């Protein structure tokens, strides 16, 4: 999924546009090239370097988020933003008068992008020393923590939207709505802080994770003879799949540069990534049913049948409300993947997962 949609390319574009707004003397393409080179160099130096850099970025992001929430809370006490009445607090979370099923599912198709990182953890399974169970625990914890933080951040931002009606009607094509709420809450300095922090997080931290996880996926598939063998080459010094890292970097750079020249580049790329995630998760849920219920006759029907079926139904509902262009390209990519799978079966290179038993 991530290989087909190149989330790093979108991260480069979003970060470059944000930094160009802050430092206009450097063009968008210059920022894209700079972010691509920096993240590639860091990843080439190995997973320890990548983990160290992302850890520092995580600390910085949490400090900025804490600053935003703290300043926002103080601004509410001073009377800026919405009045903290019971109705206001409730409407900031959910407004029954304006919420429809199509609106919710359409929003979910975009919001999925914010949570794709948690499944990227699984790409580093071979470099984890704690076993498969630790990978699953890490994914669940990451999803719950980021979800809680996102809810808190979004709730606070909702209370500082200057013109909610216009925002709902026109959307946010420039991607500045959150920074506008920071300006209302704390002034230009808070808007600049959140904008630069977001841009650097996208351009470096998020891109690092996208690049490293996608390169590991390419490496594993090449090692299992499902992709060209050169992608399985590992650097003897740094123990990284060097060719896979460089290929992902090149494709992400190209995609970022192409989309930067489109007025709807960010929106289109977001839709493509999200629809790719949706279809990928549909296939994943289907695989769970096939592996446990059909192949191994599992009796744990709630875990291995009902839960995946519910997930498939919800994901299909979200996909129906996705961008039309994203639907077409996403289905085309899914069809291409199915074709590749047929070729692999026909040539005796059937995909397999080492260590998979009948139960989980």
Placement of each model-derived feature along the sequence:
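Helix-loop-helix connectors at the membrane interface of multi-pass transporters/channels
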Residues: 1-27, 59, 64-67, 125-132, ...
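Hydrophobic, membrane-embedded alpha-helices of multi-pass small-molecule transporters
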Residues: 31-38, 71, 75, 92-160, ...
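C-terminal membrane-solvent junction of multi-pass transporters and transport-like membrane proteins
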Residues: 24-27, 39, 231-238, 278-328
């Amino acid at each position: 999924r991530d290989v087909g949609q190149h989330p790093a390319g979108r991260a480069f574009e979003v970060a470059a546009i944000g930094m160009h707004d802050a430092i206009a003397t450097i063009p968008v393409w210059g920022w894209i090239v700079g972010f691509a080179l920096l993240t590639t160099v860091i990843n080439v130096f190995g997973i320890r370097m990548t983990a160290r850099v992302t850890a520092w970025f995580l600390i910085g992001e949490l400090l900025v988020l804490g600053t935003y929430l703290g300043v926002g809370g103080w601004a509410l006490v001073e009377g800026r933003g919405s009045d903290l009445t019971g109705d206001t607090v409730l409407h900031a979370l959910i407004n029954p008068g304006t919420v429809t099923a199509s609106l919710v599912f359409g929003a979910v198709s975009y919001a999925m992008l914010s949570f794709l990182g948690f499944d990227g953890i699984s790409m580093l399974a071979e470099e984890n020393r704690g076993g498969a169970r630790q990978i699953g625990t890490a994914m669940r914890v990451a999803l719950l923590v980021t979800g809680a933080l996102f809810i808190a951040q979004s709730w606070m931002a909702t209370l500082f939207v200057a013109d909610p009606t216009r925002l709902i009607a026109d959307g946010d094509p420039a991607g500045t709505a959150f920074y506008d709420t920071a300006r209302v809450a704390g002034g230009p300095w808070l808007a600049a802080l959140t904008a630069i922090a977001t841009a650097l997080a996208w351009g470096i931290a998020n891109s690092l994770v996208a690049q490293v996880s996608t390169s590991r996926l390419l490496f594993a598939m090449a090692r299992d003879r499902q992709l060209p063998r050169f992608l399985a080459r590992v650097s003897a010094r740094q123990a990284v799949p060097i060719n896979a890292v460089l290929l992902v970097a090149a494709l992400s750079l190209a995609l970022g540069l192409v989309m930067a020249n489109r007025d709807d580049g960010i929106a289109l790329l977001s839709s493509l990534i999200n629809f790719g995630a949706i279809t990928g998760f549909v296939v994943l849920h289907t695989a769970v049913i096939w592996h446990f219920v059909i192949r191994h006759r599992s009796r744990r029907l709630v875990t291995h049948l009902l839960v995946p079926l519910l997930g498939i139904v919800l994901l299909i509902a979200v996909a129906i409300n996705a961008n039309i262009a994203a639907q077409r390209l996403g289905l085309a990519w899914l069809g291409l993947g199915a074709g590749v799978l047929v070729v692999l079966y026909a040539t005796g290179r059937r995909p397999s997962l080492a260590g998979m038993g009948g139960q989980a």
